[in-house]
A protein has these predicted regions:
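Short, small-residue-biased leader/transition segments that mark boundaries at the very start
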Residues: 1-9
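Short, conserved loop/turn and helix-capping segments at secondary-structure boundaries
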Residues: 3, 24-27, 96, 136
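Short hydrophobic-aromatic micro-motifs
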Residues: 8-11, 29-32, 64
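Short, conserved beta-turn/loop elements at beta-strand boundaries and strand-helix junctions
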Residues: 12-16
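N-terminal accessory regions of nucleic-acid-interacting proteins
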Residues: 17-30
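Catalytic-pocket segment enriched in acidic/His residues
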Residues: 31, 37-160
Length: 160
């Protein structure tokens, strides 16, 4: 199991086929998601979804910063620490797909509705890609921090 940090976009105004130029009209604000993955399940099939759908995966929070509080979501420091050790440190300027593209692309295949949350993706440094891999273990603590938004801290607990 690994955790990766992403910035998340809560949607306020739904829509379909949203042009990139109008993305701001649809973003309520910004929050944090710890995109936890059970890599053993994820790699067992050609579809990654199963490894991301366990109970307690994808914790979100601890708050939502409204869109007017973040001038540019593409200029935010983002980091993940595991037991206090920095595992990922980057900036949202390094996203493969920017927020306007994500909203336009996703709304081209599905209707976005108020309350939907879009995760932006993660920077380099995920645990399973390290040499050697670094898996999450019971007792570990994962902290995800995004500049201007806050810090989300999650303990790793064995499934009962």
């Amino acid at each position: 199991m690994t955790g990766v940090q992403t910035c998340a976009l809560p949607i306020c105004n739904g829509g379909r086929h949203i042009p990139e130029a109008r993305w701001r009209e649809h973003v309520f604000g910004y929050t944090i998601v710890n995109d936890v993955s059970a890599r053993d399940f994820q790699m067992a099939t050609s579809q990654w979804t199963i490894g991301k759908t366990f109970d307690t995966f994808a914790p979100i929070g601890p708050l939502i910063v409204t869109a007017d509080e973040i001038e540019d979501p593409h200029k935010l420091a983002i980091s993940l620490t595991l037991n206090g050790e920095v595992m990922q440190s980057s900036n949202t300027s390094n996203l493969i797909f920017g927020v306007p593209h994500l909203i336009a692309f996703l709304s081209s295949v599905m209707t976005l509705t108020p309350g939907d949350i879009i995760s932006t993706g993660t920077p380099a440094g995920v645990g399973f890609a390290r040499k050697p891999p670094r898996w999450l273990l019971p007792g570990d603590e994962v902290a995800v921090e995004v500049e201007g938004i806050g810090r989300l801290v999650n303990p790793v607990v064995a499934e009962a």
